[in-house]
Regions:
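Bacterial N-terminal signal peptides
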Residues: 1-10
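Noncatalytic scaffold domains of N-terminal-nucleophile
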Residues: 14-34, 38, 42-203, 208-210, ...
């Protein structure tokens, strides 16, 4: 409730509100759903709300929905057309695998070029109504001010706690001073993520796939024998999906 009231105050100071009666927002986390609802309340359309919810979900459910992953979206436009966006992770151009060499299954060498940001921005650019900074306000607010972490996220962290201990950044944010997982109800503040989201909200794809954020991503990956380069990030592009459809029991699927 506090999150909703605070964000509503921020919006009310800057944007003329509109009332939308025919909309539903569903997500795995109440804050992500609330973000979509708030975007509807200030005149956004379904794409604005979906993008706002997805970016907020990256903050509150990072183990499942972080901005370092991939995205596939399918949607129906107001005229009934079915389309989608393909923003899958891609293999870095410099990746090589010697004959007989086993595939890496863990660590920096397994990191592909992330597509979530490009995919969400394509959805917004092609179909959104509000400006990107407005759409991303809820996600930035939650990352910067924190939220009470839910049991489901804690359970996933506990299941992989040995991996969280392998990296300074995951230890910093998701483990306590004793290298143990946070507990349900603990407050999680992610200032670094908030800064990245701000760069994206102001500069679009260039705020993530180029510039300071991209340089830090590549520096970390290259220092740990990964493959992603600045060129890989800059050249990444989300594309329109080829939609496969068919008939089933009298319905088009």
């Amino acid at each position: 409730l506090f999150f909703a009231l605070t964000i509503s105050v921020i919006f009310s100071c800057n944007i003329e509100k509109s009332i939308y009666n025919n909309n539903v927002v569903s997500s795995p986390h109440p804050y992500a759903s609330e973000a979509g609802k708030l975007i509807f309340s200030v005149g956004g359309n379904a794409f604005d709300a979906a993008v706002a919810s997805a970016f907020t979900l990256a903050v509150v459910e990072p183990s499942m929905s972080g901005i370092g992953g991939r995205l596939q979206a399918i949607y129906m436009t107001s005229d009934g057309d079915i389309s989608g966006v393909d923003a899958m992770t891609q293999i870095p151009e410099s990746y090589t695998k010697s004959e007989g060499e086993e595939n890496d299954s863990y660590g920096y060498k397994t990191i592909g070029i992330p597509g979530v940001v490009a995919g969400l921005l394509k959805l917004h650019e092609d179909h959104g109504k509000l400006d990107l900074e407005t759409v991303m306000k809820p996600a930035i607010y939650v990352a910067e001010n924190g939220f009470e972490i839910l049991p489901g996220e804690i359970k996933r962290i506990k299941g992989e706690v040995e991996y969280f201990n392998d990296f300074e950044s995951t230890k910093k944010y998701f483990l306590n001073s004793n290298s143990e997982p946070l507990k349900p109800g603990d407050k999680l503040i992610q200032k670094d993520l908030a800064n990245v989201l701000k760069q994206i909200s102001k500069n679009g794809n260039a705020g993530f796939y180029e510039g300071e954020v991209a340089q830090k991503i590549v520096q970390d990956i290259q220092a740990n024998r990964g493959y992603i380069t600045l060129s890989d990030l800059k050249n990444y592009e989300a594309i329109e999906s080829d939609i496969i459809s068919g008939d089933f029991n009298g319905y088009k699927v």
